[in-house]
């Protein structure tokens, strides 16, 4: 039996409105992004990396800032 797949291509905007709402970007965090759903009026957190990856990036960023002497932090 042959499997036939029929997909419709939709734009990002059409996809964001599929459930009747739109996700509005709020801020990026160490392990993900925070959005606000305009339909449900609730905040949505989408994890983009695991806890170990977030901790490792935080440590490395701290080391890099220390190595640069806090360049750009004191104006």
From Swiss-Prot:
One of its GO terms (cellular component) is membrane. It is a single-pass membrane protein. The chain crosses the membrane at residues 30-52. It is found in: Secreted; Host cell membrane. Keywords: Antibiotic, Antimicrobial, Bacteriocin, Host cell membrane, Host membrane, Membrane, Plasmid, Secreted, Transmembrane, Transmembrane helix. Residues 1-21 form a propeptide. GO terms for biological process: defense response to bacterium; killing of cells of another organism. Signal peptide: none annotated. InterPro entries: Bacteriocin_IId. Kills Lactococci. This is Bacteriocin lactococcin-A. It comes from Lactococcus lactis subsp. lactis.
């Amino acid at each position: 039996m042959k499997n036939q797949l029929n997909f419709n291509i939709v734009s990002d905007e059409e996809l964001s409105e599929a459930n009747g709402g739109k996700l509005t970007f709020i801020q990026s965090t160490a392990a993900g992004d925070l959005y606000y759903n305009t339909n449900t009026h609730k905040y949505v957190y989408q994890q983009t990396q695991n806890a170990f990856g977030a901790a490792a990036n935080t440590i490395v960023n701290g080391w890099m800032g220390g190595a640069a002497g806090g360049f750009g932090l004191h104006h």
